[in-house]
């Protein structure tokens, strides 16, 4: 077995179980661990290396004298919102690389990150989508929920964006219903016609949601994030479920006062 600890405190354990490489995430004392994750089909003698605060690389030998399997894994956990004024123009210049981010992108070449900021009037979100085959029908969905009893409740909202801008806004009231949130959305497509590329191609989306439209409790909201490409959906948490138990807290050190 291999055991490591990320800077944020989470411990990572890797071991072989029934000839499968297995990972578990544990608490800071390495005493309590979550469910097992088995990313490779089989093999033996696996190990991992922590790359940075949110990334590790796991390796495993497929079979005797076979190829080495290797994969990168990204940790999604609570993100801290930075207080700043953001101009909604599709330019990410106000945002810093050190901002906490959530990551989606295990099912296809399309990947996305989500960051959060706020000021006295709005909560801001930055979506950066890397996609080398971007289609007008592809979209990203941002879900925001009050901190409640682990269930979707009135006050939750969903904003969908494409590379061309706002696609749809919905609020939750027993079911998802189209609504006006007064959200501002601006996108910027990154391709061979400009210099602001995200690695190769993709788009940037900046979103501002008025604080008056959200229910903020003790400086927190819960967020979920998904990207949809050619009807294939990749998300942090199951978007069809009404449970928010695994949604990610977005937290302000100074509290996002409602």
Regions found by a protein language model. Give the residues of each.
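Hydrophobic strand positions within the blades of repeat-based beta-sheet folds
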Residues: 3, 13-14
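Structural signature of eukaryotic scaffold interfaces centered on beta-propeller domains
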Residues: 3-7, 48-51
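Entry beta-strands of beta-propeller and related beta-repeat scaffolds
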Residues: 9-13, 54-58
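Structural motif
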Residues: 18-25, 64-72
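Conserved blade-ending motifs and adjacent loop-strand segments that build the rim/top face
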Residues: 32-49
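Acidic/polar low-complexity flexible segments
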Residues: 45, 66, 71-91, 98, ...
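Short, well-ordered beta-strand segments enriched in hydrophobic/aromatic residues
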Residues: 90, 122-129, 205-209
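Glycine-aromatic-enriched beta-strand/loop faces of beta-sandwich-type recognition domains
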Residues: 154-200
């Amino acid at each position: 077995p291999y055991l490591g600890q990320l800077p944020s405190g989470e411990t990572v354990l890797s071991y072989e179980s029934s000839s499968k490489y297995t990972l578990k995430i544990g608490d800071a004392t390495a005493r309590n661990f979550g469910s097992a994750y088995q990313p490779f089909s089989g093999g033996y003698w696996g190990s991992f290396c922590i790359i940075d605060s949110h990334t590790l690389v796991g390796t495993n030998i497929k079979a005797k004298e076979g190829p080495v399997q290797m994969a990168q894994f990204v940790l999604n956990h609570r993100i801290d919102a930075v207080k700043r004024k953001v101009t909604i123009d599709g330019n990410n210049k106000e945002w810093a690389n050190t901002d906490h981010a959530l990551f989606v992108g295990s099912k296809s070449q399309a990947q996305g990150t989500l960051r959060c900021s706020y000021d006295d009037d709005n909560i801001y979100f930055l979506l950066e989508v890397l996609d080398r085959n971007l289609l007008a029908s592809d979209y990203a969905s941002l879900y925001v929920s009050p901190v409640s009893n682990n269930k979707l409740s009135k006050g939750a909202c969903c904003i969908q964006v494409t590379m061309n801008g706002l696609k749809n806004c919905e609020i939750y009231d027993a079911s998802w219903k189209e609504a006006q949130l007064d959200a501002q959305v601006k996108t910027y497509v990154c391709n061979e016609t400009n210099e602001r590329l995200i690695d190769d191609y993709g788009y940037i989306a900046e979103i501002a949601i008025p604080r008056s439209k959200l229910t903020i409790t003790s400086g927190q909201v819960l967020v979920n994030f998904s990207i949809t490409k050619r009807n294939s959906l990749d998300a942090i948490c199951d978007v069809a479920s009404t449970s928010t138990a695994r949604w990610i807290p977005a937290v302000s050190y100074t509290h996002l006062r409602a």
